[in-house]
Regions:
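Non-catalytic pre-domain segments flanking phosphatase-related domains
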Residues: 5-11, 15-46
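Asp-based, Mg2+/Mn2+-dependent phosphohydrolase catalytic module
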Residues: 31-46, 54-71, 83, 87-106, ...
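Conserved phosphate-coupling serine/threonine residues in phosphotransfer and NTP-handling enzymes
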Residues: 79
Length: 288
């Protein structure tokens, strides 16, 4: 368990190449990461949006790639997207004939719940989310007033009234959690605002950053997935299309990072980031 002091938490959203390189060098020293042979990997963590599919359309060769991964180790679909519940991901992935259960999926919602259970189990949550997401939190926590905690999720039903309520609670000192820091979510036609954009809006209104961000690249997600899989980070690979969430997550937590160029990041972005990763055009090429 990570000890966290709410009053001293500072989240820096402005990463530069120098900072990332310094951090990566430090992590390499701490975790003694070597250039991992992909054949040594026992757990494959796969981002979804931009890695396995884009806007609901399976990336070419992804199904066959996942089948090959399963012959070598465990495959977990690891996503920051907190807009829907886990059962929706099961249906979506099975509609793509990927053959998954809830035991094959771990989300930023899972990481958020796990953090709350360990650190604030009796919280009364004001969840900025869809009705189904709120109902999901209600299985484990109280989601009725008086609220003492705000949980900001990727709410595609976001309204002005929800923002007003959340900002009022945050301004009055409520514990403030965000599920993940992604600014945008990739769609087939472009990008739409994600939780990172909501965070900036809330900060502009309240002058507060989240006390805890639970998804990639932060510690709550790493702790949660480690407990979920039981596999050492040394034998775990994170596949994703985003440098500052997926690949930074791998670097910060002793995993092998595999950047796929099927989503947000380009090869030029990677070269200027200072982060350490294997680079592939898509997940289909993971073992080539």
């Amino acid at each position: 368990m990570v000890a966290i002091c709410f009053s001293s938490i500072h989240v820096d959203y402005n990463f530069n190449a120098f900072d990332c390189q310094a951090l990566t060098n430090n992590v390499l020293k701490v975790y003694n990461i070597r250039d991992m042979n992909i054949n040594d990997i026992k757990c494959f963590l796969l981002d979804l949006d931009g890695t396995v599919y884009i806007d609901g359309k399976l990336i070419a060769g992804a199904k066959q790639a996942i089948e090959r991964m399963r012959k070598q180790g465990r495959v977990i679909f690891l996503t920051n997207n907190s807009s829907v519940t886990k059962d929706r991901y099961v249906k979506k992935l099975n509609d793509m004939e990927l053959g998954v259960t809830e035991l094959d999926i771990y989300t930023s919602t899972d990481a958020t719940k796990n953090w709350l259970k360990k650190n604030r189990p009796f919280s009364r949550l004001y969840v900025v989310g869809s009705d189904e997401v709120i109902s999901d939190y209600a299985k484990d926590f109280c989601v009725t007033p008086p609220f003492d905690t705000v949980v900001l999720t990727f709410d595609k039903t976001l309204t002005y009234d929800k923002l007003v309520k959340a900002c009022d609670l945050i301004s009055r000192g409520a514990l403030y959690l965000a599920t993940h820091p992604d600014y945008v979510c990739p769609m087939e036609t472009g990008y739409i605002p994600d939780v990172g954009s909501f965070i900036m809006l809330v900060e502009g209104a309240t002058k507060r950053k989240p006390d805890v961000i639970c998804g990639k690249p932060y510690a709550p997600m790493a702790e949660g997935i480690s407990e979920f899989t039981g596999v050492s980070p040394r034998f775990t690979a994170m596949f994703g299309d985003r440098l500052m969430t997926d690949i930074k997550f791998a670097c910060d937590n002793g995993m092998t990072g595999v950047l796929v160029l099927s989503g947000e990041a380009t090869e030029e972005d990677y070269l200027s980031s200072g982060l350490k990763a294997i680079v592939k055009r898509s997940i289909a090429e993971w073992d080539r």
